[in-house]
Curated annotation (Swiss-Prot):
It comes from Neurospora crassa (strain ATCC 24698 / 74-OR23-1A / CBS 708.71 / DSM 1257 / FGSC 987). The active site is at D161 (proton acceptor). Residues 7-290 form the Protein kinase domain. This is G2-specific protein kinase nim-1. Signal peptide: none annotated. Belongs to the protein kinase superfamily. CAMK Ser/Thr protein kinase family. The gene is nim-1. Disulfide bonds: none annotated. The modification Phosphothreonine is found at T194. Residues 636-648, 676-691, 781-802 have a biased composition (Low complexity).
Amino acid sequence: MSESDKYELLEKIGHGSFGIIRKVRRKADGMILCRKEISYLKMSQKEREQLHAEFSILSTLRHPNIVGYYHREHLKATQDLHLYMEYCGNGDLGRVIRNLIKNNQYAEESFVWSIFSQLVTALYRCHYGVDPPEVGKTVLGLGSTARPKPPSGGMTILHRDLKPENVFLGEDNSVKLGDFGLSKVMQSHDFASTYVGTPFYMSPEICAAEKYTLKSDIWSLGCIIYELCAREPPFNAKTHYQLVQKIKEGKIAPLPSVYSGELFATIKDCLRVNPDRRPDTATLLNLPIVRLMRKEKEVVEFSRTLRTKEETLNKRIRELDSKLSALETEKSSIRAEIDASLRREWEVKARLEIDRLVAQEIESLQQKFEQEVQARVEAELQRHGRGPMFNSHGQQGSFSSTAATLVSDYNLSSVGSGDGDFPSTTDITDISIAESTDGSDITKKIPRTPFHRAQTYSSAPAESVLGTPMDIEMASPSPITIASLSLSPRRMALTKAPTTNPRMIFGEEPTSTDKSNWEVPRETEMIDSGDESEAEALVPSPKRITKSSKNPFSTVTTRSRPSLNSQQNSNVLPIHGLRSKQTLATRSKTVSGVSSIGQHPLRSAPSAPSLRDRKPSPTRRLSRIPSVTGVGRRLSANNINNSSNGGSDAPSSTVTSNITVRTRGLKRMSSTCDESSFSQQQNNQPQQSLPQAPPLKKIGLMAAKNIRGSSLVELHQARAGGRPISAIISNEAKLRAFKEHATIAASAVDSSSSSSSSSGQSQLPTRPRSQPQPITANFEQQQQQQQSNTNSISSSNSAGSGSATGTGTGAGTKSMPWPVAPVWNREVETEEMPSPFIVKTSKRPASFVRPASNLSQS
């Protein structure tokens, strides 16, 4: 890459005798330079030597008031020489003078002094080869330092071509002395003998062909300052000769009045004809005004330098600020990245640590859980090991010694408890003739509380009791629970058992999983109901709903109706079903009573004293429903006592021999008599009566009251406060079948026939009549049909034989005015009424009904 390619050509700024001056820009740093293009193809040898001397001098001169020289470029192909020098933006001093002439203005004196002082300083550097001394503190005078001695062997440079066109001005009006093409380098003691300059600025010694000395440049300096002030040269003529003559005379015109005399005097000193009288550059520098100008120039230079430095520093500061901001941004980004990296790393570490601790804690809790489960399993296994066991038939065995001693804090039965865990459900075919002699089968009876639901294994620990379907209570009552209605609000508190263990009713896991033990078929016939004081416990069944405030399956918001639990048993339960040791004892006792009933008179004392003479429960409440069975039983006991004192036992034997005794769960059957004997017994009834005894017909109806259940309306009325016994009897009498009335009345006639001779006439008191309350239309039709059937049968059988009644008389025997009510060989009779939804048929099996002919023959 050539030197010319490193610069960018901008414009042409002038031309000279040797070439063209152009303005260029350096591409490296953008610096503006001045290129002087000189073609030495047509130069003579002397001119080539002068050109060589110029760039040699410029290369050694380095001063602020001298045009700077950078380098040269020699183009051999075109024989051109390019000199790159400092660029002066304001042109030269000759253009300034032309502008003043053009504008008809005078230059300011301060400007003139500034140009003068700078030219003196530049000439001082050329004449003495050193820079002039600084003003410093010697503003008022340079002293001995004003005239320095040139260094030995130094070079003295004579410009020899000072003119306004060779004085250049910078942007700040700084003077730059240039164009040293005609300069001559000579020793300090040498003098130049040739003059090659402009004739308007040549000194008198040059005109006189004398030698050229340093004082010649001072003359040229005076001519330039005078032309700047007067806008014309000091010496001017039309011909060369006249010009030389005027120069030798040395007379000049005064300066315009705008300038000071000091300036004119200084110019006159410089234009003295005698060179020895001219001041040198050192003397000129010592002038007060020059010192001030120099000092001012120094201040300006200093301010410019300071401003430049400030700009440089500001630029540097801005660069540093930008770099600092970039560094801060980079630092923040790096820190954010490091923080994010550290955060991620610590989050990962924390997550791992948390996971480890969580896993450790989970493992610890799992171990604790397994240990706890193992401990509870062992405890349950130990408890199951000493809990109740079940045999192959599903019967519950005896509890362990620990569980047997635990007694529940409340009674779980709604009607009391029997001898065993389950009541006897056997019929007459299951009764054993042999009397059980094992005393261990009979356990102590536990006092009952009324209207409590049964819960099995109540004495077992709470941890081992689990929930069963028996403890489930539906949200809405189903029809199956109407059989156990308890409509009185006063019975609600004692109806529900406080369930402390809302779990499975079985404390231990049964050994047998036979589901047939709990699937008990429902009885289609009416179930017996007796006195509530002698009621027995219900058979535990999973289908029954436990009314308990602590039942977890009960609905809190919906309260079911109070229930009156009735005793229901099935007569078709297999023999090998759920049985207990107490059941066997009950069967043997029942058969023993039946075996002797046909041979001995019927008495109240011998009929199951263990069942009759039970102590009343201390926690039992008295029912507000009148107990008809209890009244009949007390009247029967009085009649039996009367007959045992003075009468014969034949009538009682006759009556009791015809009674078919059934255990609990079967239908009751009284003496089976034909219609004729019944009518005859009614006609021959003794009229002798006790004041406290009710009529015979009422007793029969009262005894038969336990056959059929009450209607829903009557139950509501009974729970609300009860009805009179007479109204109940009169209303219930129409609901009985004819055969049921006949059997009960026949037994009463046979027992009272022996007293007909002593009393003279039989008195049949009429039962108190009350207006019946029909329930439905079908119920009224049924009453009318039953009444018609009763009348027709009574009239058709009124002529029957009286053999049955004749057998009841005896001499010396006290007659029993009231018939003896059948004594039911049961352990407990309940007063609770059966469900009205269970219809009891009046048809009896043929095996239980004895024909009338057989009765008369016996």
